[in-house]
A protein has these predicted regions:
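Periplasmic binding protein-like
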Residues: 41, 247, 375-429, 433, ...
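N-terminal lobe/hinge region of extracytoplasmic solute-binding protein
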Residues: 42-94, 191-192
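Surface-exposed binding/hinge segments that line
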Residues: 91, 101, 135-180
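Gly/Pro-rich hinge or "lid" segments in bacterial periplasmic/extracellular proteins
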Residues: 164-220, 224
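Ligand-site clamp/hinge motif
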Residues: 184, 212-256, 383
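Append "and occasionally in soluble cytosolic enzymes with long acidic Gly/Pro-rich linkers
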Residues: 281-375, 515-519
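Extracytoplasmic/peripheral linker and loop segments enriched in polar/acidic and small residues
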Residues: 385-393, 423-491, 515-519
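Long beta-strand-rich cores associated with HINT superfamily self-processing modules
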Residues: 487-519
């Protein structure tokens, strides 16, 4: 277990907490706006952009999705079913053809009506253009081009190059924008159809939204919303406690109480991605040894305060393709040492420095988790150095093209499959040429391609087998934990977070608490 590292890490945590409490007392944490008519939200970081075609990025989508802009349809986080939004109905009319009926009476924030021409434009801009939108590559294959056919103002037909049983699910990630939106550059402040419109964005300070009084759906309770960002979790928690914020994302367990927060399951799974192109990580014995060297139960119980469970695959239960037969690898440092010795005897340079790259504020106690991993890998004979990075620097390691000349990298990732289907994970993280995969095998690529064309139980079984193959024959990932989130919430508001909250926090679902109402 983590007995020795626990005491060391907890001692570090105590120092951090002491420092954090001093920071709370002496740093400006407020300025989230006045209570009452404005919903006040404090984030961990400022969004890099509000461009709708980047809304599948968590830091953008948490503000944009279904607040400022909307897709044709959206996935119910509780049931996994698709429900109507800007499309009222959809159907597959041929193996490679889907038809959508669009909602009438919808206007953009600029007063222009939403029509099928706008829907076709939005899909073409996000998927078929050269803008390099995150949705193109994450949700759609980079090489996939969709055929788009407008049928009057309220009908849209989408043609795919091959049968795609989950096209409607993919389109739930494409936000609708007016057809006057630039096709040559991404926009910073978009125009959408959502319940809120952008009033102002003061860089480095705040984003203010105002209620869309012409919204086609039910009007949200709050006339305005204001986002600020504070990197320290203790500061975010203090803003809830002092009545300076109504909602606060990603609190640390030590800052959370029953009065100021609620725990919820999110879509996130933490893992180490091992670059199998560089020695010693190019040897599967070393990669499997790392999996055996990690004490998942100790990390979950001590550092993550029980707000997680050990993971054996990149997706949690509830996502199509989850394999219930896979169990997290048992903590076995002796077996790990034996594999390292065997590799060394065959000439593998097991003493070569491995850089463990982790992102600041990635999840609570991420730095301490990185230290625990470094310690555990050192105990089995590996030389690991930690590199903490900000979001931009971490993305350079996470997305292709990867940095060159940096040696073997073990990247601490946190993957959230908010779409509910394993295709979005395997195409990104397991395919040899995937945008977030460092290597793979032709055999696994073929299985991923075949599974993508299946539906129903056959699809479930095919993807479940792929995750087993990853563990047995590839081992690019050492899975750590399926995470739970802690959302700070003021007694003055009512909001029920779900597994999608970390990716898209719907402001229209928040309402003021009634007098005397229990949480």
């Amino acid at each position: 277990m983590l007995s020795s590292v626990r005491s060391r890490v907890l001692a570090v945590a105590a120092v951090v907490l002491c420092g954090s409490s001093c920071t709370v007392a002496n740093s400006p944490s407020g300025d989230a706006g006045d209570a009452g008519s404005t919903l006040r939200v404090v984030l961990a970081q400022e969004p890099p952009t509000l461009e709708p075609c980047e809304a599948s990025l968590t830091s953008t989508g948490v503000v944009v999705r279904s607040n400022i802009s909307e897709p044709l349809l959206e996935r119910d986080a509780g049931t996994g079913d698709l429900r109507p939004l800007l499309a009222t109905a959809w159907r597959q009319t041929a193996p490679t053809t889907w038809t959508f009926d669009l909602r009438g009476g919808v206007t953009f924030h600029n007063g222009q009506p939403f029509t099928a021409q706008d829907a076709a434009f939005s899909i073409d801009r996000a998927v078929n253009s050269d803008l390099q939108c995150n949705v193109d590559g994450y949700v759609f294959d980079d090489e996939e081009k969709l055929g788009l056919e407008v049928n009057g103002d309220a009908g849209l037909t989408v043609h795919t190059t091959k049968p795609d049983p989950i096209l409607p699910l993919r389109l739930s990630f494409v936000e609708m924008v007016p057809r006057a939106t630039s096709t040559t550059a991404k926009v910073r402040e978009p125009v959408g159809t959502g319940p809120y419109a952008i009033e102002s964005w003061e860089t480095g300070v705040s984003i203010t939204l105002r209620r869309n009084e012409n919204y086609w759906g039910e009007a949200p309770a709050f006339p305005a919303a204001r986002y600020v960002w504070r990197s320290e979790p203790s500061v975010r928690a203090a803003m809830i406690t002092r009545g300076e914020a109504d909602l606060a994302t990603t609190l640390n367990p030590e800052d959370a109480t029953e009065e100021n927060s609620v725990a919820y399951p999110n879509n996130e799974t933490t893992a180490l991605r091992l670059d199998g192109r560089e020695a010693p990580l190019d040897d599967i014995r070393v990669r499997k040894a790392i999996g055996l060297a990690v004490d998942r139960d100790g990390i979950v119980g001590t550092l993550l305060a029980g707000l997680a469970e050990p993971a054996a695959q990149l997706i949690p239960d509830g996502v199509v393709g989850f394999n219930p037969t896979l169990k997290a690898a048992a903590y076995d440092p002796e077996a790990a040492r034996a594999l390292i010795r065997e590799a060394a005897a065959d000439g593998v340079p097991v003493d070569r420095k491995i850089t463990l790259v982790a992102r600041n504020t990635q999840f609570p106690r991420v730095a301490e988790t990185a230290e625990a991993l470094q310690y555990e890998l050192a105990q089995v004979g590996l030389n690991v150095q930690i590199q903490m990075a900000d979001t931009a620097a971490h993305l350079e390691y996470q997305l292709r093209p990867f940095p060159t000349g940096v040696g073997p990298i073990a990247l601490l990732i946190m993957h959230g499959n908010q779409a509910g289907d394993a295709a979005f994970t395997t195409s990104q993280y397991l395919r040899a040429g995937g945008p977030q995969s460092t290597f793979g095998t032709p055999e696994l690529d073929a299985k991923i391609a075949e599974a993508g064309g299946l539906a129903g139980p056959a699809r479930q079984d095919a993807f479940a087998a792929i995750f087993a193959d990853q563990n047995d024959s590839v081992a690019q990932y050492v899975h750590l934990a399926h995470m739970r989130g802690l959302l700070g919430i003021s007694p003055s508001v009512r909001y029920q977070p779900d597994s999608a909250t970390g990716d898209e926090m719907h402001l229209a679902a928040v309402r003021p608490a009634a007098a005397g109402e229990a949480r």
